């Protein structure tokens, strides 16, 4: 097929309004963003989410009493909220994972998390293959996983490495150093460098990824983000009066940490990354990369089963419209 040539119009036609047409339709429909938080109890997961969206959206599912027993398994808790900013409506599914990493034996503590992520892919695929497919498919696929690293100042725990390697295969992972104000600036810089080296050593493939069609601006932006990962963050829903004005902050042994001050922590960089530059890309990457890998494996498996059944003279497997897909086939 020949490359079409560019033609100059003699008069105004009006198809340039397609962008505003799309914009009106998208605003009318609203948007959806599904965020998972993974980290041990006391990491400040709920507080960071509430700080990110400047609203109380999540209650802590962790242990409120230090004498309370630890959970024996990793649980999954989903909170759904709708937030509005100007004319834009955003439906949030906030997925907490209480119990993760809290046991004495954390062997396979990641399995409920991986299963949940794959189950959402499976559910979406069932709807997609349904002969009476919905006009707008309900999307519960996890778009972003915030992975909380304890501010030890040393290195990643073996369990962190094991879980990160598995998570990055199925979801966009963004690591953060929780409660980073417990470290000095020098300790924080050294800790971040140590963790980055471990990411490379263990071949942990973190978001963002450079796509084949990324332009120079996107590539440079992604490179700048990678230089910040893992984000050293502090969350706070409390207002503290400093110099006569309220700020979102935390009081620590060195003074007051202003959450929104780039010199104090990297919360602002994380918020800008998640909300202002990469929100749509997180959603699209989930669909075009992680979900597409899952979909390909599932449909290839069904095709092989169908081919084998034909050769054996058995009835071919039915493409599912009900919970018939099994996530166990996805590796």
Curated annotation (Swiss-Prot):
* Name the record gives this protein: Septin homolog spn2
What topology in the membrane does the UniProt record assign? Peripheral membrane protein
Annotated Gene3D superfamilies: P-loop containing nucleotide triphosphate hydrolases
Q: Where is this region: G4 motif?
A: 178-181
Region span, G3 motif:
96-99
Q: Does the keyword Cell division apply?
A: yes
Tell me which domain of life the UniProt entry assigns to the organism this sequence originates from.
Eukaryota
Q: Where are the stretches annotated Disordered?
A: 311-331
One Gene Ontology cellular component term attached to this UniProt record is: nucleus
Where does the Septin-type G domain lie? 29-301
Q: Name one GO molecular function term.
A: GTPase activity
Which species?
Schizosaccharomyces pombe (strain 972 / ATCC 24843)
State where GTP binds. Answer: 39-46, 73, 99, 179-187, 235, 250
Cellular localization per UniProt: Cytoplasm, Cell cortex; Forespore membrane
The job of this chain, per UniProt, is described as:
Plays a role in the cell cycle. Involved in a late stage of septum formation leading to the separation of the daughter cells. Involved in the correct orientation of forespore membrane extension during sporulation. Binds phosphatidylinositol 4-phosphate.
Can you state the subunit structure given in the record? Component of the septin complex composed of two copies of each spn1, spn2, spn3 and spn4. Component of the sporulation-specific septin complex composed of at least spn2, spn5, spn6 and spn7.
Please provide the Gene Ontology terms (biological process) for this protein.
cytoskeleton-dependent cytokinesis; mitotic cytokinesis; protein localization; septin ring assembly; spore membrane bending pathway
